[in-house]
Amino acid sequence: MGRVEDGGTTEELEDWDPGTSALPAPGIKQGPREQTGTGPLSQKCWEPEPDAPSQPGPALWSRGRARTQALAGGSSLQQLDPENTGFIGADTFTGLVHSHELPLDPAKLDMLVALAQSNEQGQVCYQELVDLISSKRSSSFKRAIANGQRALPRDGPLDEPGLGVYKRFVRYVAYEILPCEVDRRWYFYRHRSCPPPVFMASVTLAQIIVFLCYGARLNKWVLQTYHPEYMKSPLVYHPGHRARAWRFLTYMFMHVGLEQLGFNALLQLMIGVPLEMVHGLLRISLLYLAGVLAGSLTVSITDMRAPVVGGSGGVYALCSAHLANVVMNWAGMRCPYKLLRMVLALVCMSSEVGRAVWLRFSPPLPASGPQPSFMAHLAGAVVGVSMGLTILRSYEERLRDQCGWWVVLLAYGTFLLFAVFWNVFAYDLLGAHIPPPP
């Protein structure tokens, strides 16, 4: 709690909580008269226009002035505006933003600076400063900017010709992934190349290395699962090795053959990397690994005799989340040939599922045992439509503030607990006949 003196009275203020403050009502302008109170913000006051309706009491304006004082860090308005014009320069405002510890994350501070610099005169008036600091905001700062009609300039860098190769790629990613123009401009403005999208690239590289090692060792590059030695890998999930918990995740590094690896690697790079650039390593890695884990656990429940290989659970989680996001925001997406690309993606994904179904029910070789299950593909798609869509729709918003996120997280946690108990008790209770592990 803090206190500020204004006009001879002392107002007790709330802690800085942007969600509880309000925009100054219309009809208020900055008056020239001086106040007699102490404190730097008492040099100028808010004064209603002659024809304006009655306004709330001074407490509302005191809150705005107190929050502005927090930004000014003790500097008087006379020092910031020595000529008493009612404006401060954008450069001065930028220095204030970055030189004081405000309870806003760096991205939001950057947006404050961007809004200040978007002014044609390069100035910020006192009214705008109070609006920026004390305006009521939703859980997403950039949506508050949109609601408050404070977006980046329409002729911003997204439409500039002569951009470098990397900036053109960033613009392409913004158009491909984000459905809202405000989001696209916000992403383009604040994107930094460091850290790079290392997760999807690292996973893809590791999968290729593992495939090359086993291919060279077995001299088999297609349908490697028919080779009995391949299924003996400590990375493959097999129902006879359920106690080795790492196999529920590490199976994503093994693949049936070149055909499955090529399909998964292509989608991971074409869809996974742009998603990671926009939404960050933590969210996309969480979604990918959640799809992988759900895939192996679903197989352990629905196809108890089958092993699992391949990263299809994670790949289908990413792809289904992205496709669902495109469908739900069809009008706002700017990617070209949306319908054609959607149909092509669905055909390719369906073909991969068909290949996996054929492989699962094809007659196995005597020494190879049952072939890998296709249920991981379907489980990954379910994770993508539920958890993944929630993540993709929460761009620049904290997931913990989203009610849907907690619902999805609770459902996923319940599934995990059920799957763990199933793997511990159900196999023995049901007398499931499990093929001996290789």
UniProtKB/Swiss-Prot annotation:
Q: Which domain of life is it from?
A: Eukaryota
Q: How does this protein lie in the membrane? A: Multi-pass membrane protein
GO BP, sorted A to Z? proteolysis; signal transduction
Class of enzymatic activity (EC top level) = hydrolase
Transcription among the record's keywords?
no
Q: Region annotation Disordered: residue ranges?
A: 1-62
Entries under InterPro entries matching the protein: EF-hand-dom_pair, Peptidase_S54_rhomboid_dom, Rhomboid-like_sf, Rhomboid_IM_Serine_Proteases
Q: Which GO terms describe its cellular component?
A: membrane; plasma membrane
Q: Which reaction does it catalyse?
A: Cleaves type-1 transmembrane domains using a catalytic dyad composed of serine and histidine that are contributed by different transmembrane domains
Keywords assigned by UniProt?
Answer: Hydrolase, Membrane, Protease, Serine protease, Transmembrane, Transmembrane helix
* Enzyme active site: 312, 377
**Tissue and organ expression note:** Detected in heart, brain, skeletal muscle and kidney.
EC number(s): the record gives 3.4.21.105
Q: Where is the composition biased (Acidic residues)?
A: 8-17
Pfam families with a match to the protein in the record: Rhomboid
Function of this protein?
Answer: May be involved in regulated intramembrane proteolysis and the subsequent release of functional polypeptides from their membrane anchors.
The UniProt family comment states: Belongs to the peptidase S54 family.
Instruction: Return the protein name.
Output: Rhomboid-related protein 1
Q: Which organism is it from?
A: Homo sapiens (Human)
